A protein has these predicted regions:
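His/acidic metal-ligating clusters that form di-metal
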Residues: 45-49, 144-146, 159-270
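Extended active-site neighborhood of metal-dependent phosphoesterases/phosphodiesterases
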Residues: 1-5, 70-186, 213-217, 305-307
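N-terminal active-site segment of His-dependent metallophosphoesterases
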Residues: 1-70, 74-75
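Active-site environment of divalent metal-dependent phosphoester hydrolases
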Residues: 22-25, 58-61, 89-100, 153-156, ...
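Hydrophobic alpha-helical topogenic segments used for membrane insertion/localization
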Residues: 350-372
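Active-site-proximal beta-strand elements of phosphoester/diester hydrolases
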Residues: 10-23, 142-152, 194, 283-289
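Binuclear metal-dependent phosphoesterase catalytic core
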Residues: 2, 7, 130-134, 237-238, ...
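Metal-dependent catalytic neighborhoods of phosphoester/phosphodiester hydrolases
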Residues: 25-30, 54-77, 95-113, 205, ...
Length: 377
């Protein structure tokens, strides 16, 4: 498939994180809610490409009944494929759980989902590949989309819980990037990175929380668990949990800066986070689940639309839109989770009521009101 900018010079990419669908989907209202969101999103945004950011379907069934897995995957993406919209996907850590990665990659391809391995077989990972977006006339390569396999858990959990993108993958990326420079007049081709597990530099979008911010702060993950974080000034949207990045920094982000041209990186993996911001000039965006199967905190399941402009490929627009913002009503969540939109809103409202009831002091009321407005939305 050859991607190119539309006649209006735009190219729209719609992102879905961590759907985690299960084999009982045909009778489960959580699947219906996910499909409501996916359907509403593709109908409203009319994307040129959809991207699934890993942990898309439960692979526990694969050993016993691979056909049931294929049927589930086919039904999950039906709102996209039935509208003849291309869809690409990366492998999440759970697609690696049972040792069927090569078969799963092949099954994605057979269903028309873009997933393959362009890297040499000796390179770590089962699905490292790229797609080029051409000019609207189809003649000139303009933009590159990288799809990187971020692997599973580290083989030594004392070093890191989650694995990272390995050195040989980084070397492959750098070598391929050099080839793209030749196609782009000797300059780095502007590009995006799509992968499941975030890089450690994502923590640079956060800062250590002050004690009065602890009700809305998140605990860091694994080796950072003794520290509580909130978003830095300039970090957009919702920090719902400590980013679950590797504990070892293997230099992937440094490689992006070295190669040049990487405008943004988009991750799944963390089911509550949808925050984003710039680190050293690279836009990094975390994607919470677009489904209702994984742990979540209300009707905040969302999608992200990224729009490229052929006339200015080094700039892009992006927006989040959540389940309730589409005017949808959940069939799978209880009344509390349907009413409140996230953990922080619930926490701050409870704290507000308790503080006001106990103290009745204007100063405390003002502080609680400020915290609700600042952090609770």
């Amino acid at each position: 498939m050859k991607f190119k900018f539309n006649s209006d010079g735009k190219f729209k990419i719609l992102l879905f994180g961590d759907i985690h669908e299960h084999t009982d989907y045909k009778t489960n209202p959580r699947f219906k809610d996910m499909q409501k969101l996916m359907t509403a999103a593709v109908e409203e945004f009319k994307p040129d490409l959809c991207v699934l950011l890993g942990d898309n379907c439960n692979t526990d069934i694969y050993t016993e009944d691979p056909e049931k897995f294929r049927e589930m995957l086919r039904d999950v993406v039906a709102p996209i494929t039935s509208r003849n919209i291309p869809v690409a996907a990366v492998l999440g850590n759970h697609e690696h759980d049972h040792g069927h990665e090569d078969e799963i990659v092949a099954d994605y391809g057979k269903l028309g989902i873009i997933m393959r391995n362009d890297a040499p077989a000796k390179v770590t990972g089962n699905a490292n590949f790229k797609e080029i977006i051409y000019s609207s006339d189809g003649e000139k390569p303009v933009f590159c989309l990288w799809f990187i396999d971020s692997n599973n858990c580290h083989e030594n959990r004392e070093i890191s819980h989650y694995d990272y993108v390995h050195t040989d993958q980084i070397e492959w990326f750098e070598a391929e990037s050099e080839k793209l420079k030749e196609l782009n007049g000797g300059k780095p081709m502007p590009s995006f990175i799509f992968q499941h597990t975030p890089v450690p530099e994502e923590y640079e979008l956060l800062r250590k929380a002050h004690f009065w911010e602890l009700p809305v702060a998140v605990r860091g993950y694994n080796t950072k668990k003794k520290t509580f974080y909130v978003g830095k000034k300039g970090t957009m949207d919702y920090v719902g949990e400590g980013p679950c990045s590797p504990d070892v920094n293997n230099g992937q982000f440094a490689s992006w800066k070295k190669v040049g041209g990487v405008l943004g990186a988009f991750f799944g993996h963390d089911h509550l986070n949808d925050f984003s911001g710039f680190v050293d000039g690279i836009f990094m965006a975390q994607h919470k689940t677009a489904g209702f199967r994984a742990y979540t905190d209300g009707c905040r399941s969302c999608v992200r639309l990224v729009t490229l402009d052929e006339k200015n490929p080094h700039k892009f627009e992006q927006q989040l839109k959540r389940f309730k913002q589409f005017g949808l009503k959940s069939e799978s969540l209880g009344p509390v989770m349907r009413t409140f939109t996230d953990r922080q809103v619930i926490t701050m409202h409870v704290l507000g009521y308790l503080a006001l009831a106990a103290a009745g002091v204007t100063g405390i009321a003002f502080l609680i009101k400020f915290l609700i407005e600042r952090f609770g939305g």
